[in-house]
């Protein structure tokens, strides 16, 4: 066999190193997710982890993002019920908790934290009250985990959600 050109060899090596770095980073992400899932709970291809303290809606969402997740978003009644029972166990003493739903951009048009429209709602009777003051949504820890809109600056407990890559 002919000796390879040194340029091509370096490129191959560089590509291999890049590939290894991507694999290492992917493993790190999976490891972090495993830790979250172990500390919290795993439901419907998502892991949930309850907050220790209370924060405003924005601070809560930023905290979740910093940990690689978002505020939890129940996408069905099944998810909503599972989330509420986890909240009841892990947010002892909290009446409600922030979820990743708001109408900050357009009054009355509720979207998730990524700005995408949501199709599942679980509003309490006479909610949302609306108005430009109450733009962030909290779910109750009791009953059927009904939603109510509240002032975003209010300090509440929250649960972060992490999607499990399939």
From Swiss-Prot:
Disulfide bond residue pairs? 37-47, 64-160, 136-152
GO MF terms, alphabetically ordered: carbohydrate binding
Q: Where is the C-type lectin domain?
A: 43-161
Keyword tags: Disulfide bond, Lectin
Its GO biological process annotations read:
ossification
So which domain of life are we looking at? Eukaryota
Gene Ontology cellular component list: extracellular space
CDD domains in the cross-refs = CLECT_tetranectin_like
Keyword Disulfide bond belongs to the record: yes
Query: What's the protein name?
Result: Tetranectin-like protein
Which species is listed as the source?
Answer: Carcharhinus perezii (Reef shark)
């Amino acid at each position: 066999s002919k000796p390879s050109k040194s340029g091509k060899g370096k490129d191959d090596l560089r590509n291999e190193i890049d590939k290894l770095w991507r694999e290492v980073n992917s493993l790190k992400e999976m490891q972090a997710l495993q830790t979250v899932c172990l500390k919290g709970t795993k439901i419907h291809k998502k892991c949930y982890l309850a907050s220790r303290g209370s924060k405003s809606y924005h601070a809560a969402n930023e905290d979740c993002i910093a940990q690689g997740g978002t505020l939890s978003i129940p996408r069905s009644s099944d998810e909503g019920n599972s989330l509420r029972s986890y909240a009841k166990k892990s947010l002892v003493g909290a009446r409600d908790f922030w979820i990743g739903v708001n109408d900050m951009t357009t009054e009355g048009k509720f979207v998730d934290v990524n700005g995408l429209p949501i199709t599942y709602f679980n509003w309490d009777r006479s909610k949302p009250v609306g108005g430009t003051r109450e733009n962030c949504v909290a779910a109750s820890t009791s009953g059927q985990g009904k939603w109510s809109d509240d002032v975003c600056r209010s300090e509440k407990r929250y649960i972060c959600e992490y999607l499990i890559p399939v």
